[in-house]
Protein backbone atom coordinates (compact mmCIF):
# COMPACT_ATOMS: atom_id res chain seq x y z
CA UNK A 1 0.00 0.00 0.00
CA UNK A 2 1.30 3.46 -0.91
CA UNK A 3 2.44 5.68 1.91
CA UNK A 4 0.67 9.04 1.34
CA UNK A 5 3.67 10.94 2.70
CA UNK A 6 5.90 9.67 -0.14
CA UNK A 7 5.73 11.35 -3.53
CA UNK A 8 5.40 9.38 -6.74
CA UNK A 9 8.86 10.40 -7.99
CA UNK A 10 10.46 9.12 -4.77
CA UNK A 11 8.52 5.86 -5.02
CA UNK A 12 9.35 5.39 -8.71
CA UNK A 13 13.04 6.14 -8.25
CA UNK A 14 13.47 3.94 -5.18
CA UNK A 15 11.25 0.99 -6.06
CA UNK A 16 12.63 -2.36 -4.86
CA UNK A 17 15.78 -0.80 -3.40
CA UNK A 18 17.33 -1.91 -0.15
CA UNK A 19 19.67 0.26 1.83
CA UNK A 20 21.83 0.44 4.89
CA UNK A 21 23.12 3.53 6.68
CA UNK A 22 26.78 3.49 7.72
CA UNK A 23 28.89 6.17 9.34
CA UNK A 24 32.12 5.58 7.45
CA UNK A 25 33.99 7.95 9.75
CA UNK A 26 33.75 5.40 12.55
CA UNK A 27 35.75 2.16 12.70
CA UNK A 28 32.52 0.16 13.00
CA UNK A 29 31.00 1.75 9.91
CA UNK A 30 34.13 1.21 7.85
CA UNK A 31 34.45 -2.40 9.06
CA UNK A 32 30.81 -3.07 8.16
CA UNK A 33 31.37 -1.74 4.64
CA UNK A 34 34.45 -3.92 4.21
CA UNK A 35 32.47 -6.92 5.47
CA UNK A 36 29.72 -6.23 2.91
CA UNK A 37 32.35 -5.74 0.19
CA UNK A 38 33.65 -9.29 0.71
CA UNK A 39 30.65 -10.70 -1.16
CA UNK A 40 29.74 -7.70 -3.33
CA UNK A 41 30.18 -7.59 -7.08
CA UNK A 42 30.25 -3.80 -7.34
CA UNK A 43 30.86 -0.83 -5.06
CA UNK A 44 29.57 2.51 -6.39
CA UNK A 45 30.50 5.62 -4.43
CA UNK A 46 29.50 9.22 -4.95
CA UNK A 47 32.04 10.97 -2.77
CA UNK A 48 35.08 12.83 -4.00
CA UNK A 49 38.03 10.46 -4.46
CA UNK A 50 39.94 12.36 -1.75
CA UNK A 51 37.18 11.54 0.73
CA UNK A 52 37.40 7.83 -0.09
CA UNK A 53 41.16 8.03 0.40
CA UNK A 54 40.78 9.74 3.80
CA UNK A 55 38.31 7.05 4.84
CA UNK A 56 40.73 4.30 3.84
CA UNK A 57 38.33 3.04 1.19
CA UNK A 58 40.38 3.29 -1.99
CA UNK A 59 40.24 0.58 -4.64
CA UNK A 60 43.39 -0.94 -3.15
CA UNK A 61 41.69 -1.19 0.25
CA UNK A 62 38.60 -2.90 -1.18
CA UNK A 63 40.67 -5.19 -3.40
CA UNK A 64 42.33 -6.61 -0.28
CA UNK A 65 38.99 -7.99 0.93
CA UNK A 66 37.58 -8.82 -2.52
CA UNK A 67 40.00 -9.03 -5.47
CA UNK A 68 37.10 -9.30 -7.96
CA UNK A 69 35.18 -6.21 -6.85
CA UNK A 70 34.30 -3.58 -9.44
CA UNK A 71 34.97 -0.15 -7.91
CA UNK A 72 33.13 2.75 -9.53
CA UNK A 73 33.24 6.43 -8.61
CA UNK A 74 30.37 8.77 -9.47
CA UNK A 75 31.82 12.15 -8.63
CA UNK A 76 31.26 15.51 -10.26
CA UNK A 77 34.56 16.19 -11.97
CA UNK A 78 37.45 14.13 -13.26
CA UNK A 79 40.51 13.36 -11.18
CA UNK A 80 42.62 15.64 -13.38
CA UNK A 81 42.11 19.15 -14.69
CA UNK A 82 41.10 22.52 -13.25
CA UNK A 83 38.05 21.23 -11.35
CA UNK A 84 39.57 17.99 -10.06
CA UNK A 85 38.62 17.33 -6.46
CA UNK A 86 35.92 19.97 -6.33
CA UNK A 87 32.48 18.97 -5.01
CA UNK A 88 29.52 19.02 -7.38
CA UNK A 89 25.78 18.67 -7.27
CA UNK A 90 23.03 18.50 -9.87
CA UNK A 91 22.31 22.24 -10.25
CA UNK A 92 26.00 23.03 -10.66
CA UNK A 93 26.46 20.37 -13.33
CA UNK A 94 23.30 21.52 -15.14
CA UNK A 95 24.60 25.09 -15.15
CA UNK A 96 28.05 24.13 -16.40
CA UNK A 97 26.49 22.06 -19.19
CA UNK A 98 24.20 24.89 -20.32
CA UNK A 99 20.95 23.04 -19.60
CA UNK A 100 19.23 26.08 -17.99
CA UNK A 101 19.95 28.12 -21.10
CA UNK A 102 18.62 25.36 -23.35
CA UNK A 103 15.43 24.84 -21.35
CA UNK A 104 14.47 28.45 -20.63
CA UNK A 105 11.21 29.69 -22.07
CA UNK A 106 11.34 31.86 -25.18
CA UNK A 107 11.88 35.48 -24.25
CA UNK A 108 12.63 34.70 -20.61
CA UNK A 109 15.44 36.63 -18.98
CA UNK A 110 16.12 34.00 -16.34
CA UNK A 111 17.49 30.55 -17.22
CA UNK A 112 15.39 27.60 -16.11
CA UNK A 113 16.85 24.46 -14.60
CA UNK A 114 15.42 21.08 -15.49
CA UNK A 115 12.84 20.23 -12.80
CA UNK A 116 14.38 16.82 -12.13
CA UNK A 117 17.74 15.78 -10.82
CA UNK A 118 18.65 15.12 -14.43
CA UNK A 119 22.45 15.04 -14.12
CA UNK A 120 22.29 12.57 -11.23
CA UNK A 121 19.90 10.31 -13.13
CA UNK A 122 21.98 10.37 -16.30
CA UNK A 123 25.09 9.46 -14.30
CA UNK A 124 23.24 6.51 -12.77
CA UNK A 125 22.19 5.25 -16.20
CA UNK A 126 25.70 5.69 -17.59
CA UNK A 127 27.20 3.83 -14.62
CA UNK A 128 24.77 0.95 -15.02
CA UNK A 129 25.67 0.66 -18.69
CA UNK A 130 29.40 0.88 -18.02
CA UNK A 131 29.28 -1.78 -15.32
CA UNK A 132 27.18 -4.21 -17.32
Regions found by a protein language model. Give the residues of each.
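N-terminal helix-loop segment corresponding to the beta1-alpha1 unit
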Residues: 1-132
Amino acid sequence: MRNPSMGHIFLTTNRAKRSVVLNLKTPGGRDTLLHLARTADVLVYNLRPQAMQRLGLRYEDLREVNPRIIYVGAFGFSQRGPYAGKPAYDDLIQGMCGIPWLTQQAGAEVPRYAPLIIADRIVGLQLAGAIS
